[in-house]
Structure formats: structure tokens, C-alpha cells
Amino acid sequence: MGSFSIWHWLIVLVVVLLIFGTKKLRNIGSDLGGAVKGFKEGMKDDAPKISESDKGGHTIDAEVKDKQNS
């Protein structure tokens, strides 16, 4: 009773096609696909690139001076 059968989904699909038409739905689908593709490319560009010289750590030699309160 709470779930939809295949007939419910077919009726919803027919109503959506009648309201929007196939051309409008095709445009919406291509726009959505372009947005997903752009998002994936943007996520790839944000990944930090580690070069060969940055893989190792850098050592800094220095003397430690204690600050004494007088």
C-alpha cells in the first residue's frame, strides 16, 4: 500500500511528458549532465598535485633559545 508499482511510475512519466514535452526534458537532461561533468572536472582540479621535489620533508637546522623571565 505504501510503495508505488510500475503502473504508478508509468502514469507519472506520461503526465510529465505531457506537461513538459520531450524537447524540454532533453534540454534539462543535457544541462544536468553538463553540470555533473563540470562538477567532476572541478573536483579533479582541486586535488593537490605533489611534485617529485615535494615528496620528502625539509630539515631546518637552528639553535633553540630559551626566553627567561627576569
From Swiss-Prot:
<protein>
    <recommendedName>
        <fullName>Sec-independent protein translocase protein TatA</fullName>
    </recommendedName>
</protein>
<keyword id="KW-1133">Transmembrane helix</keyword>
<keyword id="KW-0813">Transport</keyword>
<comment type="similarity">
    <text>Belongs to the TatA/E family.</text>
</comment>
<comment type="function">
    <text>Part of the twin-arginine translocation (Tat) system that transports large folded proteins containing a characteristic twin-arginine motif in their signal peptide across membranes. TatA could form the protein-conducting channel of the Tat system.</text>
</comment>
<feature type="region of interest" description="Disordered">
    <location>
        <begin position="46"/>
        <end position="70"/>
    </location>
</feature>
<keyword id="KW-0653">Protein transport</keyword>
<keyword id="KW-0472">Membrane</keyword>
<feature type="transmembrane region" description="Helical">
    <location>
        <begin position="1"/>
        <end position="21"/>
    </location>
</feature>
<dbReference type="InterPro" id="IPR003369">
    <property type="entry name" value="TatA/B/E"/>
</dbReference>
<dbReference type="InterPro" id="IPR006312">
    <property type="entry name" value="TatA/E"/>
</dbReference>
<comment type="subunit">
    <text>The Tat system comprises two distinct complexes: a TatABC complex, containing multiple copies of TatA, TatB and TatC subunits, and a separate TatA complex, containing only TatA subunits. Substrates initially bind to the TatABC complex, which probably triggers association of the separate TatA complex to form the active translocon.</text>
</comment>
<dbReference type="GO" id="GO:0043953">
    <property type="term" value="P:protein transport by the Tat complex"/>
</dbReference>
<keyword id="KW-0811">Translocation</keyword>
<dbReference type="GO" id="GO:0033281">
    <property type="term" value="C:TAT protein transport complex"/>
</dbReference>
<keyword id="KW-0997">Cell inner membrane</keyword>
<keyword id="KW-0812">Transmembrane</keyword>
<keyword id="KW-1003">Cell membrane</keyword>
<dbReference type="Pfam" id="PF02416">
    <property type="entry name" value="TatA_B_E"/>
</dbReference>
<dbReference type="GO" id="GO:0008320">
    <property type="term" value="F:protein transmembrane transporter activity"/>
</dbReference>
